Amino acid sequence: MAEVKLQEGESLENALRRFKRKVQQEDIIKEVKRHSFYLKPGEKKRVKEALARKRSRKKARKEQD
């Protein structure tokens, strides 16, 4: 869990900025969204395959240029 302690003389805005950066670096938001609802194994597989197709199409387009 991301934790930020206020340093002496530090403004709350700076501490909040450090906290947000730490949360992004640790991918906490992504994990929370991933665990917010249950996906059946078949649905997980379909999502994974769709992402793989999307990546391969993107890679093919990039190679054409």
Curated annotation (Swiss-Prot):
User: Which GO biological-process labels does this protein carry?
Assistant: translation
Q: Can you list the GO cellular component terms from the UniProt entry?
A: ribonucleoprotein complex; ribosome
Concerning InterPro entries, the annotation shows: Ribosomal_bS21 (IPR001911), Ribosomal_bS21_sf (IPR038380)
Q: Give me the stretches of Basic and acidic residues compositional bias.
A: 43-52
An example molecular function term from Gene Ontology annotations? structural constituent of ribosome
Q: Which UniProt keywords apply?
A: Ribonucleoprotein, Ribosomal protein
What segment(s) does the record annotate as region Disordered? 43-65
Basic residues: which segments have biased composition? 53-65
Q: Indicate the family of this protein.
A: Belongs to the bacterial ribosomal protein bS21 family.
Protein name according to UniProt: Small ribosomal subunit protein bS21
Q: Which organism is it from?
A: Koribacter versatilis (strain Ellin345)
Q: Which gene encodes it?
A: rpsU
